[in-house]
Amino acid sequence: SSVLRGSGLSSSAAFEVLIAAILDGLYNGFVVDAKTRAVIAQKVENVYFGKPCGLMDQMASSVGGMVTIDFKEQDAKVEAIACDFAAKGYALCVVNTGGDHGDLTDDYAAIRKEMEAVAAHFGKHVLREVELETVESHVGELRRACGDRAVLRALHYYDENARVLEQAAAIRG
């Protein structure tokens, strides 16, 4: 992988998926599918490296290219988005800003914990199982039960999901 370490561009996920692919090739003849490689890589990140991440980075790294991922079902729906930026007169540039995300494990753990707390308030495991309108209509009690930051993160989650759908539609269209 040529992804810069600690850059916030899923360098650990890219590395884990690379190792999974190498081992799959050496011992299995490349029979393990991209989703399974991603799940294996996530397990490595969670257990071996002690980083409480979700599956998004590993799935995107394993499938490759530009993708949308819907984690609503247990078996994540992954869809490639074909886009030739150059043909449309654009270039996708990655810039090394010198930032380092290497020591943010506790911060990432807090995000997941707080979002799960909001979901648990409604008897669910993840926010994907809770409608935005439900969260919006219970903001007061959520603030008291989970805190302001958890509520803001939950609202940001819904905004991000809507933005991704809009961007995917724009790229396809």
Regions found by a protein language model. Give the residues of each.
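Gly/Ser-rich oxyanion-binding loop with an adjacent helix/lid
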Residues: 1-85
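C-terminal nucleotide
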Residues: 68-173
